Amino acid sequence: MKKMLLLAILLVAAFANAQKMTTITYFQNDTLKLDLDLFEPETASKTKLPLMIYVHGGGFSGGERESGHNFCKYLANNGFASATITYTLYAKGKNFGCDGALPNKIKSFQFGANDLWLATSYFIKNSKKHNIDVDKIFVSGSSAGAETVLHGAFWDFKTMNLYKNTLPKDFKYAGLVSGAGAIMDLNLITKKNVIPMLFFHGSADVTVPFGTAAHHLCKTNASNWLMLFGSYSIYNHAISLDESASLYTYCGGGHEYSGTLFEKDQFYILNFLKEVLDGKKVKHHTVFKTGKKTDKENIYGFCE
């Protein structure tokens, strides 16, 4: 019995350490130094690895890349390379609320997306060094990180790029995972550039809309008013474009669910990634009842 227990402990310990982490500076100039933590399977792979790049949340003013460590370790233990990045927190020290300045909000999205492109560019240029399959680069993020990856995936980087020659012509990510994210314009997502996506979001989120609403539910006369299209709206748009899309709705839930699938139940994301890599087209909406009460205006039919 003692031998069995010891064996179980050793197996758990081995699994917990079945990946290696390396801290890398993926961009540096005279005023900026950006790092990432790369997690790779401990055992070298004979084939190129798919890569997930994770962007943390924090309202573009806070948060740390270390918050993505557990998610990245999980993916590394399942055969993926996975990186969590530091990025420019443009809103730090600025008013991001309804009475703030709208250009600062747009710039926050832009700087975040540009740093994501820089990290992606690093891996493309160093794909042999890290054994990365450049055709299988996924992106993911929570809250502000989700807004970063959504705009990074669908903005025209030739127009929005702050740096030269960041990504190859016609580059597309292999897929995207968004936790309580939103995008400024659904029209950015077209039949030509749409990619497989997984979303999870609380239906009563008042910080980032689940459907279509103003950011932070600001009034229309607010100086920082900006319409955003959240997970439910993007999901339906992707379905209309006949693309793979999965949505996990937490009925009655707020913004506290923005990191749920990164922190626990990570197998939902892993299954999505495997489906994409296997070339499967999946369209489904899963509803979780949280037991939380919401205002009638926030209740969707599938949450009743």
Region locations from a protein language model:
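Bacterial Sec-dependent N-terminal signal peptides
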Residues: 1-21, 304
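Primarily recognizes the serine-hydrolase "nucleophile elbow" in alpha/beta-hydrolase
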Residues: 66, 121-193
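Cap/lid segment of the alpha/beta-hydrolase catalytic domain
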Residues: 87-110
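C-terminal catalytic histidine-bearing segment of alpha/beta-hydrolase fold enzymes
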Residues: 228, 232-304
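Alpha/beta-hydrolase active-site loop
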Residues: 103-128
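The feature captures the conserved acid-bearing segment of alpha/beta-hydrolase catalytic domains
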Residues: 164-241
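Short substrate-entry loop that stabilizes the transition state in hydrolases
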Residues: 44-49, 55-95, 206-210
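N-terminal cap/lid segment of alpha/beta-hydrolase-fold proteins
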Residues: 18-47
